[in-house]
């Protein structure tokens, strides 16, 4: 069988050393496994620039979609409203998840070959103060587009979207 170099978001080509490590059976109760898990969790918190006494990282096994579903259904409360910026199949899948979970949402659809416009997001947020959360795919693999999360994130941060909702639950 021919060996291919897969330059795609997934499935990924892995090295023999990675494959060999994946063959090792780890017991979740072993101290070395727990130590590795804790290091990963601490590293994720560091990456997010947050502290262990305020946040935790939960490692999950599953597809990217299962991770998105977990976030949307655990972070967004019954009185919250979500704005989804979609420019591909994975952004649209967030709307499907929200629909099935009974999450109140609106969707800003952009063409598959265009990045969601931060100014348009600002206009949508200004027009609807009920929006408490904004979701957008960073790397929309259906089109190969890397969305400008910095620009959209600034718009969201400037309007303190999500902060009031989080404070109410604490």
Task: Tell me the role of every PLM-derived stretch.
Residues 66, 74-130:
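PLP-dependent aminotransferase-like
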Residues 116-167:
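Active-site phosphate-binding strand-loop segment of PLP-dependent enzymes
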Residues 10, 22, 64, 98, ...:
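Buried hydrophobic positions in well-ordered alpha/beta secondary-structure cores of metabolic enzymes
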Residues 1-31:
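N-terminal "arm"/small-domain region of PLP-dependent enzymes with the aminotransferase-like
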